[in-house]
Amino acid sequence: MIVVRNVFRLKFGKSKEAVALFKEGIAIQKRAGVEMNQRILTDIVGTFYTLVLELTVPNMGALEANMPKVMGDKDWQANYQKFSALVESGYREIFMIVE
């Protein structure tokens, strides 16, 4: 199993708006037929205005197979364009689950 964490540093005060857009994005993914185990995480302590989309997938192939389906969806693209306007920076972490 693989855990993918997409970590976004948001613009000041934009967490609630970003979470709402991410929830909408996940709904769009499901309508497109892409079901992934996902969680939305927000900061409690540490760097302010951090949002994480965490995915758990069986392997990298499963992630690679689903990404074109999601990113090719016009509704998802429109949603992500709104979301990206709220982001200062971001990065991705990919981990193998050992236990």
What are these regions (language model features)?
Residues 2-8:
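Active-site-flanking beta-strand signature of metal-NTP-handling nucleotidyl enzymes
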Residues 5, 50-52:
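Structural preference for beta-strand elements that scaffold enzyme active sites
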Residues 9, 54-56:
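Short hydrophobic/aromatic beta-strand micro-patches
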Residues 9-20:
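Short, surface-exposed ligand-recognition loops at beta-strand->loop->(often short) alpha-helix junctions
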Residues 20-38, 56-93:
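An amphipathic, aromatic/His-enriched active-site/gating alpha helix that lines ligand/cofactor pockets
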Residues 39-44:
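Short, solvent-exposed loop/turn elements at beta->coil junctions and helix N-caps
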Residues 45-49:
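Short acidic/glycine-enriched loop/turn segments that link adjacent beta-strands
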Residues 94-99:
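Short hydrophobic/aromatic patches at helix-to-coil boundaries
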